[in-house]
Swiss-Prot record:
Subcellular location: Cytoplasm
Lineage: Bacteria, Bacillati, Bacillota, Clostridia, Peptostreptococcales
Residues that hold GTP according to the record: 155-162, 201-205, 255-258
Residue segments, region G3: 201-204
Record's keyword annotation contains Cell membrane: no
Protein function: One of the essential components for the initiation of protein synthesis. Protects formylmethionyl-tRNA from spontaneous hydrolysis and promotes its binding to the 30S ribosomal subunits. Also involved in the hydrolysis of GTP during the formation of the 70S ribosomal complex.
Protein name: Translation initiation factor IF-2
Family of this protein: Belongs to the TRAFAC class translation factor GTPase superfamily. Classic translation factor GTPase family. IF-2 subfamily.
Encoding gene, per UniProt annotation: infB
InterPro entries reported for this sequence: EF-G-like_DII (IPR053905), IF2_II (IPR044145), IF2_N (IPR006847), P-loop_NTPase (IPR027417), Small_GTP-bd (IPR005225), T_Tr_GTP-bd_dom (IPR000795), TF_IF2_bacterial-like (IPR000178), TIF_IF2 (IPR015760)
NCBIfam families on file: IF-2, small_GTP
G1: annotated segments: 155-162
Region G5, annotated ranges: 291-293
Amino acid sequence: MSKTRVYQIAEELNISNEELINKLAELDINVTDKDSVLEGEELELALEMLGEDLSQENGNVIEIDGKLTVQVLATKLDKSPSEIIMKLMKMGTMATINQEISFEIAALAAKDYGFELTVAESDDTEALEIEALMEIEEDKEEDLKPRPPVVTVMGHVDHGKTSLLDAIRKTDVISGEAGGITQHIGASEVKINGHKIVFLDTPGHEAFTSMRARGAQVTDIAILVVAADDGIMPQTVEAINHAKAAGVPLIVAINKIDKPGANPDKVKQELADQGLLVEDWGGEVIAVPVSAKKKEGIDTLLEMVLLVAEMEELRANPNKRAVGTVIEAELDKGRGPVATVLVQGGTLTVGDPIVAGVACGKVRAMINAKGKRVKTAGPSTAVEILGLSEVPQGGDQFVEVPTDKIARSVAARRQQIVRDEMLKSTQRLSLDALFSQMSEGSIKDLNIVIKADVQGSVQAVKQSLEKLSNEEVQVKVIHGGVGAVTESDILLAAASNAIIIGFNVRPVPGAESLGEKENVDIRTYTIIYKAIEDIQAAMTGMLDPEYVDEETGKAEIREIYKISGVGTVAGCYVTNGKIFRNCKVRLVRDSIIIHEGELAALKRFKDDVKEVNSGYECGMSFVNYNDIKEGDIVEAYITKEVERKL
């Protein structure tokens, strides 16, 4: 309806004329009586705002609690499911009776029936209490006690990681290896000078990437194993970058010093090239020459671990509810779900109810690093636990809770959240997504992993990209290497919220699917400048745009008219350029700007016009401004957004 009288609107909304007039006044729409006419924007505003207000006042508000399916919506609206399905089809959404639909779509459908959908607020006191229990307690200074360091050994294949761990444990596990890959994942404990050190046997990158991707930090110190006769290799560089990204202290073990071709100084030079300057070269990185085969330098290495641990002041409170991280977990045919956990605070005891991710249960048994059953495990202790309801994920936090019931409630709640998340479409971590997040200010750095066929390309691109950095946007190449894009690259990128750029290389089998699973964008190029252009485009989009005012025309006010019901109208003569109906205006009097605003109307004679050219007369009125005088100058302008360049 283009024009509608007040009494007609009152009938439509089922309220009295007087009540409608009062409500219109609240919306700054002034009408005199029931025969007053509303049209255009005023009419639309009145119907929209009053419709919403009245729906709430009349109780037409539906609360949605939990899963929202077509069946649930039909029941809430007191309509048949088939009618709701047809309604959704008209809206462009295909859904079956038991299919879950988005709240936004359901709200639009409900609005057509005169109802408003809202999400029910939970007043579940028990749920709030459970959440409070899950909060990690703040430790008091007097409760903190020194704890053993947790160490991960990293390095290139065949540089002697397992041999070094074997030498440290003084037990032979290499005979149980297959294809040079560590088969069992767990932990080892050694004592030196009365102090305990915990070694995680998990593959080095796992301790940093998958854990960090879930917000867990389990490693205190990383030992980087480099063969004295081989030097820095691609996986060594990966290990260095993983440790740097995690912010973990690094100790270098220069292994195989007993071999004829050993050259520790060459290794130190290559370390310096990677930004790791060793102590005897004036740096801060500890480097220890060792021979895992002859068990030389092992004690010195362990003493250095204790020294770094002392400098790090590693402490924890053993007298509170146990909390820690799941290192890895599996489903054992005979024992059910089995998880290796690292206790990081408190003391875990057999019989304690715990929650680990979406799993829960009472600890039925605990096995320590030596394969013996234990009843308690304090801070920096890794144990295998039995009794969980299902297999948790590596990197999940576990927390001890007061009762079994609370454990089940928390796990059930988390499972529901996981199900809800799975229903949402997962957005890939692409340049476009990064650009969007950056524009919102949620990302300050653009992290990149570079892989190429030759080292020269890696260095060239790294330097080119880092030159794009400015005070608003920082490009960080967190890893660059030669060779195909590997699963390790994907894990590093996922943990660091990075994208992967490849030059003349492709992902190895399995890496692409892992990239999709971890929502990592892998971009491959054959021309370097194209990659630089893409990154530059993403960064340029991050910069806040600049706005400039572009003057379109000027007019002089020559006459003033007072028109009843309209207000003050300026009779103008356009002296320069054009005056547009949708432009902004400045009123200038004696070279001083007295008002900035918008045009309420632009007319030629009695007709509304979109523009008036120079040399023509016109009538203007201004939004919420009437204090104009003859001789005032009207400057018309438009505001343009100017894209900034790097």
